[in-house]
Structures are given as structure tokens and as C-alpha cells.
């Protein structure tokens, strides 16, 4: 019966609204249910599986459909860690984290929940509690729409990062006067199916940060098109970059957070290759050489640990 409630379209995409209605109707009069995960049904009734995180996704879908007050996700860790345990020994567990903060950390490489498992409950403003099956006494991490009042004192929620990026640097005099220059540049990447991670710029310069792996197959063609179509004064590519994100909703209330981050990196004798910070001040992202990645993570974590 279960597969008839979790529904996929003919093209294999998940039909969230039809599924929400079907599960809601099926469970409306049931107090307790054991529901398998990972799969659902195509329009013709054949079984179709979720691509990743199937059991987590199923739990989230059911939580939304029944209007749950809380979605408990039991796993093998005691919650969201503030840093990568492969780099930081025994990083502390985050007690509360917002959906937005979690998305930033997950996108930058933190291994928590697959994004598809968060989306259904986020739409319904249902909190998630990540718990450890092997340590049920641990409170775990609560993923919430907004932080409780006491959590606003925390400046930094976590640090995450990822290696494997390249920077395509383009320079042209009077670039700022050419309407659509950056749009044209980004379209060249889009034509080859490459999305950009960040796009820091100056008056006459712009850098496109992309995945090195994604860039590799079309690298020469992209550089040729940039030269032919945009006529820049200079184009170069820097490989071997790592991106690091310092994430925290409380940073907006703390003066000097960015200055502190830059000072810590400088004191570690690491050169910052790129800086990006949104106006919402939810995160600060820097690029460093891959060879400096682990040292940068350790330096940042120990510097901000007491304000986490």
C-alpha cells in the first residue's frame, strides 16, 4: 500500500503535492504506523526509488503530511557538528541551527541531511531533531525555522568547506561600462552546463569560481569563447582552490567578525584568494589554496570556538 502514497511523475520526478495529499488521507485515522522508505510508485504502478537519502526523505514527507509537531531523525551521530571531525578532533555539537544555516553548511560540504530530506518539513515549518541511535540520551540538534532567544548570543554556528575549485579571472578596461558583460560571461559557462559558485568583481575585473571537475571538459572552449566574444585584456585560470564558509546567523549582531576571521588566517600565514559576504551576513566565504585548507579550518575553528 505504501508505494501508492509516495508518487512520482512519468519523468521520474517526485510529485510532492500529490504525495502529501495521498499520505495525509491514508494516515488520518491511524495512531501508529511503520512505514518503509526509499521508494514510491510511477503512474503505471512500478516501483521507483529516491536517488539519495531515501529513508530520511520519506520520514520528512510523512512528517509534513500528518502535520507533525517534530520530525525526529535517528542516525549514527549526535547531531550537527560545528566542523569536520576529520580535521577537528571532537568538534562540538550544535544545539540549535536554522534551516538557512544548515543549507549553507550542507552546501559547503558538511554532511548532515540531504537537502531533499529537509525541504518538505521546512515548507511546513516543522522542526527536525537529529538524534543518535547509539546514544539516545544525547539531546542532538534541533533544526528550526528561527532560533530561540538564548541562541542569538552565539555568533558562529559552524565552519565547513570543500576542495576542488578553480577561479577564471577576466580583466578588461572599462568593463563596468559594458552593459551585460558579466551576464554574457556567465552565459558562456551556462552554455556548457556549468554553474558558478561565486562571482567576486572589481571595476575592471571579475572572477568566476567554479568546480574544477565541471570546468575540465570544456575548459579550452570556454577560454576561447571568452577571448573571441568579450575581447578581454587578460584571462587566466587558477586551480587548486578550496572554499571555506564561516556560518552564523548571529554574525550580523557582532562587530568585527570578518576582521577577526581575516586576522586569524593572516596569523596562520595563509593567503586569502577570494572573499565573499552577502548583505544578510549569514556567512563569510573565503578561498584559499588547497594546501592551506586543513590549517585554515583548524585556525578558524579554534579562534571562534568560544563564541559558538
Q: What is the predicted role of each segment?
A:
Residues 139-308:
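A conserved regulatory-domain signal marking ACT and ACT-like small-molecule sensing domains
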Residues 124-139, 163-164:
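Active-site C-terminal subdomain of aminotransferase-like
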Residues 43-44, 82-83, 129-131, 139, ...:
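Short helix/loop capping segments that flank catalytic or ligand/cofactor-binding pockets
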Residues 70-74, 128-130, 197:
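Short hydrophobic alpha-helical runs that function as membrane-insertion/retention elements
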Residues 3-4, 38-39, 75-80, 85-86, ...:
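Short, ordered loop/turn segments at secondary-structure junctions
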Residues 29-30, 124, 192, 268:
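Structured helix-beta-strand junction loops
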Residues 3-113, 118, 211, 287-289, ...:
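Nucleotide/pyrophosphate-binding catalytic subdomain
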